[in-house]
Amino acid sequence: VHWTGEEKALVNAVWTKTDHQAVVAKALERLFVVYPWTKTYFVKFNGKFHASDSTVQTHAGKVVSALTVAYNHIDDVKPHFVELSKKHYEELHVDPENFKLLANCLEVELGHALHKEFTPEVQAAWSKFSNVVVDALSKGYH
C-alpha cells in the first residue's frame, strides 16, 4: 500500500486526538448491538457487552494494542499481524467479515468522537488504514 504524506498525517491526527480505549470499547458495544451474532465469538463475556464492562474493556485493550502495532508499522502492516491472523483463523475461527464490521463500527465512533474534525479527507485516510488492518488480519485465511 502506498501512503501519501497527507494520508499519514491524517491517520496520525486521528490516532493522536482520540481516546483509543474509549472509542474502541464503544465500537465493540456498537458491534454487539448492530450485529448481535458477533457475540457468539465472545462466550467468555458472560453476557456483558457494554463499553463499560470489564470484559469489553479488556478486549478493547487488545484491539488498541493491535491498532498501535499497525499505526507504528503503517508502511508494512502484514508481517506484524501474521500470528494474530493465525490465532483468529486457527484457534478462534472468526469469520474475517467480522473484522470489516468492527472496522465500520470503529469508523462511526471516530466520527462521533472527532465531530467536525472527521472530514471527508480524514474519513478516507482512516478507511484506507482500516482496510489495511482488515486485510492483514484476514491474511491467514487465504
From Swiss-Prot:
Ranges of residues in domain Globin: 2-142
CDD domains: Hb-beta-like (cd08925)
PROSITE patterns: GLOBIN
Protein's name according to its UniProt entry: Hemoglobin subunit beta
Gene Ontology CC terms: blood microparticle; haptoglobin-hemoglobin complex; hemoglobin complex
Residues annotated to bind heme b: H59, H88
Keyword Magnesium attributed: no
Subunit structure: Heterotetramer of two alpha chains and two beta chains.
GO molecular function: haptoglobin binding; heme binding; metal ion binding; organic acid binding; oxygen binding; oxygen carrier activity; peroxidase activity
UniProt keywords, alphabetically: Heme, Iron, Metal-binding, Oxygen transport, Transport
GO biological process, one term: hydrogen peroxide catabolic process
Stored Pfam families: Globin
Similarity-based family: Belongs to the globin family.
Translocase among keywords: no
Lineage top rank: taxon: Eukaryota
Tissue: Red blood cells.
Function per UniProt: Involved in oxygen transport from the lung to the various peripheral tissues.
